[in-house]
Regions:
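Residue(s) in the substrate-gating loop at a strand-loop-helix junction
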Residues: 171
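Substrate-binding pocket helix/loop in short-chain dehydrogenase/reductase
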Residues: 126-128, 132-140, 236
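Short-chain dehydrogenase/reductase
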Residues: 1-109, 123-126, 134-135
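Short C-terminal tail/terminal secondary-structure segment
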Residues: 2-4, 125, 176, 256, ...
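Alpha-helical segment proximal to the catalytic Tyr-Lys
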Residues: 156, 200-204, 264
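A conserved structural motif in NAD(P)-dependent oxidoreductases
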Residues: 240-251, 262
Length: 282
């Protein structure tokens, strides 16, 4: 991992969904840039997690079998860099739980300067006419309301201190649409709208708000999908200008930049980190 020369020295970041995939890459990159990092995730394996649903337990076992790194390992890796880190269990759809978790993290770490809204869900594909209202509402709660909850929870502290950075994870599906992804695409364009509103309202308090817009990224989930349907993934690769997927570090590097003072005059931007997939016309 390349050094960012302590661009974020002295800052405290909170990354939702930070235990694996893009969230883990984001957390490690922020730490590499000098930040202390709080990992907020629904899948936390420790005495901080007194209960777990049957579904969560099944998912944990499945992902563990695939060699997925968990929250505690990410926290340990950050501490090895000489940064402070802690893990908190957080369901971003649980509004009170989000506020309680942020308050606890701020108390233990001193404050929250940076929020990366990475937590999200995209685990089903259904044509619009077959889309269930239950899955539609779940995607809205996780991807859009979850980002809203977390941003509100950190907003007061950022406003009081006169400095803050919010980065929301959107998707090219929000810009281009996605076949069989009515709910997911809708939530991701909604995230961009939320991002721009926060930018307008936050500027007077020196709070910037930006979105990073990934295309196809070689995350753990993408690699698992490769094993199931490589032909489909190859078609997606060919739609990018580079003919390949990006890496989680490509997203993480963009986030570090947007959180740094080098991007202090950038706000309300939806930054495509997509390999040019949105340029594909035929």
């Amino acid at each position: 991992m390349s050094s960012w020369d302590n661009l974020l020295e002295g800052k405290v970041a909170l990354v939702t969904g930070g235990s694996r995939g893009l969230g883990r890459a984001d957390a490690l990159a922020l730490a590499d840039a000098g930040a202390d990092v709080v990992i907020a995730d629904i899948m936390v394996e420790s005495d901080q997690t007194p209960t777990r649903t049957e579904q969560e337990s099944m998912l944990a076992q499945m992902m563990k079998a695939q060699g997925v790194v968990y929250t505690e390992q990410t926290v340990e890796d950050i501490r090895k860099m000489g940064r402070r880190s802690m893990a908190i269990k957080m369901d971003v759809t649980d509004r009170q739980g989000v506020f309680d978790g942020v308050a606890r993290a701020a108390k233990e770490m001193g404050r929250i300067d940076i929020l990366v809204n990475n937590a999200g869900t995209v685990d089903h594909v259904a044509r619009f006419e077959k889309q269930s209202i239950e899955l539609w509402e779940r995607d809205l709660r996780v991807n859009l309301t979850g980002s809203f909850n977390c941003a509100q929870a950190v907003w007061g502290g950022m406003k009081e201190r006169g400095w803050g950075r919010i980065v929301n994870l959107a998707s090219v599906a929000g810009i281009m649409g996605g076949f069989g992804q009515a709910s997911y695409s809708t939530t991701k364009i909604g995230v961009i709208g939320l991002t721009r509103t926060l930018a307008l309202e936050g500027a007077r308090y020196n709070i910037t708000s930006n979105a990073v817009v990934p295309g196809i990224i070689g995350s753990e989930a993408f690699k698992m999908a490769d094993a199931l349907n490589k032909e489909m993934n190859d078609r997606m690769r060919k739609r990018t200008a580079f003919g390949r997927e990006g890496e989680p570090e490509d997203i993480a590097n963009a986030i570090v930049f947007l959180c740094s003072d080098k991007a202090r005059y950038i706000t309300g931007v939806a930054l495509n980190v997509s390999g040019g997939i949105e340029l594909f016309t035929f």
